[in-house]
């Protein structure tokens, strides 16, 4: 948890996510783990938040962290479970999880999540991109040695998954640089 906060750019991710999901009231975070990014919505009383993950230990920890917040729920489940419950969300968030799965699994997760999206809803995907020559040594070290995901993709590769596998159009795509350190 501490490692992720210090080197994973959690603070900047929260700012980016808050910017794009501001005004949405039913939020689903897929792959929420222990709730690092979920804290973005902690002080928004009008938000109904559900975080899901397949890691039961992480979900139990998230439940403890958010025990005083009635508008927060965490479940150990998969997307198919939510679809069978006919749940709908205004905002769906993938925060640094797709680089841990294959292209076909990422496509499947995105396709399933689109079935949970309410009309005029939005899906936000925040993923690390491979380090480039222009990046400093810290970014390269993190990207090449410390990043645990085995499927870090380029922006174009993510766009191809969305457009080719899902047959969807991307309404907006942007690259935001996030700090690797909490004190920057």
Which role fits each region the language model picked out?
Residues 97:
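Hydrophobic adenine-recognition pocket in adenosine-nucleotide-binding enzymes
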Residues 25-33:
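Conserved class I S-adenosyl-L-methionine
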Residues 7-24:
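Conserved alpha-helix/loop element of class I SAM-dependent methyltransferases that forms part
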Residues 81-86:
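Short conserved loop adjoining the S-adenosyl-L-methionine
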Residues 107-119:
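A short glycine-rich, Lys/Arg-flanked "PGG" loop and its adjoining helix->strand segment in the class I
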Residues 93:
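A conserved beta-strand element that flanks and buttresses the S-adenosyl-L-methionine
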Residues 34-36, 40-80:
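Class I SAM-dependent methyltransferase SAM/SAH-binding core
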Residues 125-166, 170-180:
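C-terminal alpha-helical "lid/dimerization" subdomain adjacent to the S-adenosyl-L-methionine
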């Amino acid at each position: 948890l501490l490692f992720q906060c210090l080197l994973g750019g959690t603070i900047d991710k929260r700012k980016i996510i808050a910017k794009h999901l501001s005004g949405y009231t039913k939020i689903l975070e897929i792959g929420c783990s222990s709730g690092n990014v979920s804290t973005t919505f902690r002080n928004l009383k009008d938000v109904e938040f559900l975080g899901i993950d397949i890691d039961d230990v992480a979900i139990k920890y998230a439940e403890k962290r958010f025990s005083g917040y009635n508008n927060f729920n965490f479940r150990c489940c998969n997307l198919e479970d939510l679809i069978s419950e006919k749940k709908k969300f205004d905002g769906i968030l993938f925060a640094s999880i797709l680089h841990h799965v294959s292209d076909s699994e990422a496509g499947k997760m995105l396709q399933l999540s689109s079935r949970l999206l309410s009309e005029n809803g939005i899906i936000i995907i925040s993923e690390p991109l491979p380090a480039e020559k222009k990046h400093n040594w810290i970014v390269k070290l993190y990207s090449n040695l410390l990043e645990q995901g085995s499927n870090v993709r380029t922006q174009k590769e993510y766009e191809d998954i969305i457009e080719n596998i899902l047959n969807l159009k991307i309404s907006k795509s942007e690259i935001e640089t996030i700090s690797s350190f909490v004190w920057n």
